[in-house]
Amino acid sequence: MAGQRTCQRRSSRAGPGKMQEPPKSIEEFLKFQNWDYWPREIHFRDDDKWSCTLKKIKEDSSFVSIYTHLWENVPRIFEALLIMESKLKEYSLILQNHTSEIFKWKSMISETSSYRKLERYGEFLKKYHKKKKIMLSDEMETEKNIEGCSFTGFKANELTQLPRHLDAEQIYLFILKAHNFDERVFKIWKTHFLSEASIALLHDSFWWWFLHKFRPDRENQDCLFDRISESYVTLFMSIPLSRKDAFFQIYPDCLAQAIYATFHEAFPESSYLFNDEFKEDLGNNIFLWCSGLKPQKGFWIHWKLKELSTTTIHGSKKAPAKSVKERIADSQEHISTSIDFNIIKILNNPRAYTLPISKEESRLSRLATKSHYSSTGPEFNRVLFNFGGQSPLILYYLKMHELAGISKAPKKTKIKLTKIFQEPLPAPTYRDVIKEAKRQFARNQKDFRILQAKATKKPHEVKQDFEKFLHKLRSEAEIERECVASLSSSSSSSPSSTDNYNFEEEEY
């Protein structure tokens, strides 16, 4: 009120003709109204009541309370599914209880006689309902060398059996297990490898290669090749499109391994014939048939078939190459060394009484890491490759059946393919160089220690040896300079002689 009175007085003094300016900011307005002390703290009479109400409002407006309210009151579309799920759980528990009552061992058979009968029936089924594996014993009266085997002749409607009753399926399984495929991949590849077309490919390819290397017979080889082509096309068409690339990247290599394993298993006495050259020729032939390209040289190095020299494809041990007398002598020596021992000597020096590890076992225990030659690498060249060409086996099949459109096929584009022209010559590997450097370093250290000990005892003698060594180096350097000078003088005189030779050649 006092503020209003003062304002009225000021306005009356100023006169009617002069107006006061309005406030330009909130501060001026508050000061003009005499409210510059606002806002003041507001005190409610019932503070506890207000705080309780505020807390309740916060709780009611929280996410949990809103979600709970909606869950309890809003009707849901998937409520029928929840009811169905709860009923299924209930019924599954009832079914489990019911089955546990049915298959109780005591209610099914008695403890003694019925159980023994069941065991006998199980053994009988295992014995007669499992597919038999033909184990080749040493007492079999079949020939174990190439000389005692012959091709019985091509039959159009029947595959020629492999020698010594070998089973193609077991050979394929042996090769697949050696690759250590993943379990899921192994099951997929197994169905394709053991298909009828793949089995026929192994039979006919083995006999074709047998005739080609040891019993040349053009007529039978041609008949076998015709069926090989048909079997390969059948196998190619049976593989799903999504698996074709992956399968036919490994199939030629696996087929070559299977043929090699068949030769090794069928003719153990002729294993010396199946050397690295034999593997190289066999693999090149199979790869060229399937894809038209040769594999990398030495592709067979990754084959895990070294154990074929000691074990069969079924895992049974082969007879050792030693004679009976040698084996008896070795066994007697081993028994005598193992029986005659002194426990006190063994405890004092246990290393002297440990059995030595054979070279073969030590070689297998260590992982062989490849070391490259320290010389230059392989030489490469560029060859033309038909990018749209067919596999030779498939192309032969198309020509053999004279399918329409083969001769009218458009010309395919060719690309340049990098190929190894020549492998590097055998030379010391980097591992050999490192070993030799370590040996030389050890020798240098030994010589240095000897020289150091000699210098402390006989310094004058060491000084004389050092002077002799320097004199030897100077003389060798002088001889080398003289040789270089003589070579340079002879090279400077050589152009004239070559010119004369060229002139005589032109006159002639």
Curated annotation (Swiss-Prot):
Coiled coil: none annotated. Residues 1-22, 485-508 are annotated as: Disordered. Pfam families: FWWh. Residues 486-497 have a biased composition (Low complexity). Belongs to the FAM227 family. This is Protein FAM227B. It comes from Homo sapiens.
